């Protein structure tokens, strides 16, 4: 698809954040990261709509739209990090992606969107990142994940647990960027670590589709400045 050259800016921001950590060498901060990568090509080994894929978490996912490959890849990586996080001290989990066109309609060019699960909201994770971003010119808007955003991904039949997404573009889907976060939480198994669980885990999803920069043009580097300010400078 034309214009997808910048669809890897989420993974690139993870690399950029770690490059910054290598320069600053902050003490008392443990950070682990991964870059979820997938080449969404046609061919004999491609994936197709209506295919049912079992996620790393064991959840059966029916593919609704092959253009939503990013949330599939991130869900498996998040599932692994979720399993490791339960044994860590005060862990915070994040996913970062140029995920939806919907967020561009919602907030306009230049603004990242951050949205928390229940445990992260209790600790005001999104407002912390938003305030840090304001201080360094890396603007964020806070979105809320509602129950409808979780219910939307209910599997329509007995054969699957979840529906990856509908077959409309996110720009034509109400709550398009929040729905994606709800799916990632459920597909990764992170919904088993909410406020009512024995081991709650803080998780925030960052959609940088509107803030990653123009194409063609120079990438913005968002959300690296906000994350450095929030978790290094202000830590």
Predicted regions span which residues?
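A generic structural signal for tightly packed, nonpolar segments enriched in small/aliphatic residues
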Residues: 1-235
């Amino acid at each position: 698809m034309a214009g997808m050259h910048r669809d890897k800016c989420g993974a690139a921001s993870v690399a950029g954040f770690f490059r910054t950590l290598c320069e600053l060498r902050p003490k008392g901060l443990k950070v682990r990261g991964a870059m979820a990568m997938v080449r969404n090509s046609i061919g004999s080994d491609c994936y197709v709509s209506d295919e049912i894929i079992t996620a790393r978490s064991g959840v059966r996912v029916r593919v609704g739209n092959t253009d939503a490959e990013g949330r599939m890849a991130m869900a498996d990586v998040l599932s692994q990090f979720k399993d490791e996080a339960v044994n860590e001290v005060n862990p915070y989990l994040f996913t970062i992606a140029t995920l939806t066109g919907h967020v561009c309609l919602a907030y306009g060019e230049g603004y990242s969107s951050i949205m928390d699960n229940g445990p992260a909201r209790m600790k005001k994770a999104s407002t912390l990142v938003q305030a840090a971003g304001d201080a360094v010119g890396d603007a964020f808007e806070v979105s809320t994940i509602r129950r409808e955003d979780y219910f939307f991904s209910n599997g329509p039949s007995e054969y699957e647990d979840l529906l990856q997404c509908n077959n409309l573009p996110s720009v034509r889907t109400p709550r398009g960027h929040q729905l994606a976060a709800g799916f990632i939480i459920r597909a990764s198994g992170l919904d088993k670590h909410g406020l009512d669980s024995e081991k709650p885990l803080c998780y925030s999803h960052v959609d940088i589709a509107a803030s990653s920069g123009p194409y063609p043009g120079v990438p913005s580097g968002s959300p690296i400045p906000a994350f450095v300010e929030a978790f290094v400078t202000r830590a």
